[in-house]
Amino acid sequence: MAAAPVLLLAAAAAVVVVAMVLRWLLLLGGPAAGRLGKRALMPPGSTGLPLIGETLRLISAYKTPNPEPFIDERVARHGGVFTTHVFGERTVFSADPAFNRLLLAAEGRAVHSSYPSSIATLLGARSLLLTRGAAHKRLHSLTLTRLGRPASPPLLAHIDRLVLATMRQWEPAATVRLMDEAKKITFNLTVKQLVSIEPGPWTESLRREYVKLIDGFFSIPFPLANLLPFTTYGQALKARKKVADALREVIKKRMEEKAENGGSIGDDEGKKEKKDMVEELLEAEGGSFSEEEMVDFCLSLLVAGYETTSVLMTLAVKFLTETPAALAELKEEHANIRDMKGKKQPLEWSDYKSMPFTQCVINETLRVGNIISGVFRRANTDIHYKDYTIPKGCKIFASFRAVHLNNEHYENARTFNPWRWQINNKLQNAVGANIFTPFGGGPRLCPGYELARVVVSIFLHHLVTRFSWEETEEDRLVFFPTTRTLKGYPINLRLLSESIC
């Protein structure tokens, strides 16, 4: 009996190996391989070793603070668009802003988004990330309706309260892993936006399962993973079910409430405050969204809100700490804002619009940190670019990082310099030239990008006006499987004597 799990694991591994061998043989001899084999038409490059290609080199590079050589060396040899072989298939990499613009704009026509099967299974087929065409447009529009209006006074007040509630746990001094604290803020904020539930035992229980789900995104999706709960992916599948069940229970209850009220949430003020994403879904298109569509959609928004914004908050503090002049200027900007307000008065939209240097810091953190290093697409048809033809079915990676850190586009591109964004129209020009795409672009432009800026701005305001801090130990950035600091950025915090927190 004790040998059973081992035998199952061995069988699963054998299935994976056989599948990879068959895939490789098909690439060499199948119909699509006829097009792929015409090397003169494909962008130049190297496919590396059989089966694994250059995957190990890519992972090795992205597990260091300096992954640039992987792309830089190939760009130097082959140009801004080159071919490699990673994660089981031949892939075209683009460090060319013009080609990246084409790929982002062509979503749903010449290309479609493509992600590893591990991510697809854990998010659900009806998630915002994976839907295409009219279905994606429908969900994207709804997300914009809810998340694209950060100027809402109730939302700003809630963000302010949530940030302060977290920071009060640090008084009068504390040692924290800043990334963990930031993730608590972004998770609780996203849950509030989705289902109107305040932080408490329910949200903390959900967050613990959610962390396990996230861990499975870049693990190996063994065919028998549901029978192998001791693997990272198996644990992620179990956590996914628990998160989905918790969301489903809330959605069912809200559907019942809506039915009892004759299809309306009612007119009293308390119910109007419950106008969250679930309510938007229940009212949209005559209530045509199914229960499972709503579960997948809400789960995918948890991913978007939880991971990226919390990393942005952490990296902003890390980069500021390493750049004292920038930190001093940021402190001055926020001290001036606080001096003009009552001591305990929450921030308002006009305050947010009075943070120009803060926006420079956020822009530069996005550019240098590259929380989203790029996006994968798959060709729906043969794509002709310059002298190359990328065949239908080929995977393409548009690298934002390679563009953001290119000295041809930014002077001393790998140096954190928020003052570069003070130049007139710098942001507009960079976006227009497609050399600044931290939130993607085209039909899949991140619908919550402005909300993310607001959250980070409010967080930085309260941090610099209430606390001093210092790093407790050296921490470094890594970029695989996602952008993060290796140790969660541990810092010592001390409440300022004049703070009103």
Swiss-Prot record:
Signal peptide: none annotated. Catalyzes the C23-alpha-hydroxylation step in brassinosteroid biosynthesis. Converts 6-deoxocathasterone (6-deoxoCT) to 6-deoxoteasterone (6-deoxoTE) in the late C6-oxidation pathway and cathasterone (CT) to teasterone (TE) in the early C6-oxidation pathway of brassinolide (BL) biosynthesis. One of its GO terms (biological process) is brassinosteroid biosynthetic process. Its main location: membrane. Heme binds at residue 446. Pathway: Plant hormone biosynthesis; brassinosteroid biosynthesis. Pfam families: p450. It is an enzyme of class 1 (oxidoreductase). It is a single-pass membrane protein. One of its GO terms (cellular component) is membrane. This is Cytochrome P450 90A3. Its cofactor is heme. PROSITE patterns: CYTOCHROME_P450. The chain crosses the membrane at residues 2-22. GO terms for molecular function: fatty acid 2-hydroxylase activity; heme binding; iron ion binding. Keywords: Heme, Iron, Membrane, Metal-binding, Monooxygenase, Oxidoreductase, Transmembrane, Transmembrane helix. It is found in: Membrane. Belongs to the cytochrome P450 family. Its EC number is 1.14.99.-.
